[in-house]
Swiss-Prot record:
GO cellular component terms, semicolon-separated: nucleus
Pfam families linked to this entry: AMMECR1
PANTHER family tied to this protein: AMMECR1 HOMOLOG, NUCLEAR PROTEIN AMMECR1
Alphabetical UniProt keywords: Nucleus, Phosphoprotein
Location within or outside the cell: Nucleus
Name by which UniProt lists this protein: Nuclear protein AMMECR1
UniProt modified residues of type Phosphoserine: 16
Compositionally skewed regions (Low complexity) per UniProt: 27-37, 101-119
Chain residue ranges for the region called Disordered: 1-39, 101-120
Domain AMMECR1: 119-313
Amino acid sequence: MAAGCCGVKKQKLSSSPPSGSGGGGDASSSSHCSGESQCRAGELGLGGAGTRLNGLGGLTGGGSGSGCTLSPPQGCGGGGGGIALSPPPSCGVGTLLSTPAAATSSSPSSSSAASSSSPGSRKMVVSAEMCCFCFDVLYCHLYGYQQPRTPRFTNEPYPLFVTWKIGRDKRLRGCIGTFSAMNLHSGLREYTLTSALKDSRFPPMTRDELPRLFCSVSLLTNFEDVCDYLDWEVGVHGIRIEFINEKGSKRTATYLPEVAKEQGWDHIQTIDSLLRKGGYKAPITNEFRKTIKLTRYRSEKMTLSYAEYLAHRQHHHFQNGIGHPLPPYNHYS
């Protein structure tokens, strides 16, 4: 079931802040990953299980998009519905919700992030190969090539987001994901194209934009229901809220862990932005905030620029037998 991180119809979730404001936009189906645009929740027409979310503040407009038929996932040069929120536990205690292969720490968002976390914690799952795979899937789609081979990285199920940014200022270009755990090979393949082509805040991506793109993959872990809506840490936790709007309808919305820190928001500003993103239009009072059901989570995140993708592809091109030519508009020495 699709869901935008701001959650509306079929509870789509969106996790990025609305564009042009420090507050929220309307909430709906897809999920964005950056703070620039609004995330409206709507239903996305791309097939596949999972709750679709916008991961960076705002709502991505509703309405089903034209479906994309994707062939089975295949790798790029290496490496391998609605959202049900449980009621908060008794105050003062967070309940850890089971997530597949949950990791203990979130990863840095830069492309140079190490693939292991702090000493003593488990090795991170997210990797540059996952971003490379997303680039390869998008490239093959835009140029009409057969989809690449199955990647070599793990195919364990995770809730995930794929985020695209563009240009030197890294403006948000698309961000959609799901809170439903999906096998990574099919999930990344699906949400690569959904976020690039079906984010209703933006027109579909074109070939000309490829050289300026940055791709981020976020794997969501460590979901915990908490009693206090302030019981989460800015820059560490992503948050997903469930609330009843002024019309008596249940709504959901989410921000990925990096959003509040990037926007310079404190807890209250983040919650209020998320309520607006989720479509709450009445005045926000402290009493209303206390009625929110909040789930906090962490993420592992990896970002890769197009230039880094090309370097990776060039290195692995022959040994991995990629069945389509390298991008024609960048020169190799």
